[in-house]
Amino acid sequence: MSVIVPPALVPVSPTTRVISCAADEIGEVAAAIVATVPSDGVLGVATGSSPLALYAALIRRRAEGLRTEGLRLLALDEYVGLAASDPRSYAAYVRSVIAEPLGIPAHNVRVPSGSTAADGAAYERAIAEAGGVDVQIVGIGRNGHIGFNEPGSDAETRTRVVELDESTRRANAEHFGGDLSLVPTHAMTQGVATILSARRIVLVAAGSTKAAALRAALTGPVTADNPASFLQRHPDVTVVADPDALREDR
């Protein structure tokens, strides 16, 4: 695995490390970091396509002896209005893609749910009661969102219901048969401040469609216009991305 960081993409923050590797290496490289979580630690999990290779690598490591059954999982977000049993829900994703293959029992898995401020506050309490997150996995949206913190989300936000940007809904329509009308308009998401409270953050990104947002997050000003830019304020961030996501000319 080679580490090649284009000069223009040297992050502003001295506490952010960027690892550039081939797209098919991202999962293994990120999993090596995530595997440092204690066997009974707390892992913050993202959903979607970006971290799939990471989870597959963790599953392989479990087959080779990594102890994962004692991990506690805390998910970043969930659509409002989808039952946990709905295969399109993030509760179903976390269960089928992460928890069950890693042997993690249901009582050690929490996914945001509900649609009220009280529900958001309850999830914040659950994070605190777990002792906080050891490693938080995140992706980055084309508009710079992390979790479902869309542009305009400030650094003080906590778990809450948000309205999804149309660009986000369009990007996720593939999981709803390509029908935008079926994609929920709102979600419950951990806030920026919630994400930043994790002890370590690992961001995974692949493909040129993420390049502009990632470049702005790493080298641009810290601004609510690109919520991922708030990661510059965190003391321990590792970005694992392929050369396309780190291109300077996008």
Give the predicted meaning of each segment:
Residues 1-43, 245:
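N-terminal glycine-/serine-/threonine-rich phosphate-binding loop
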Residues 2-14, 66-137:
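Ligand-binding beta-strand-loop-alpha-helix segment within the catalytic cores
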Residues 6, 193, 197-250:
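ATP/nucleoside-binding phosphotransfer catalytic cores, i.e., glycine-rich phosphate-binding loops
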Residues 39-64:
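Glycine-rich N-terminal segment of FAD-binding domains in flavoprotein oxidoreductases
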Residues 45-50, 138-142, 206:
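Glycine-rich beta-strand-to-loop/alpha-helix junction loops that act as flexible
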Residues 57-67, 151-160, 220:
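A glycine- and small-aliphatic-rich helix-loop capping segment at beta-alpha/alpha-beta transitions
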Residues 62-72, 103-104, 194-198, 231-234:
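Short, conserved loop/helix-junction motifs that constitute active-site signature segments
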Residues 143, 147-192:
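Class I SAM-dependent methyltransferase SAM-binding "motif I" and its flanking Rossmann-like core
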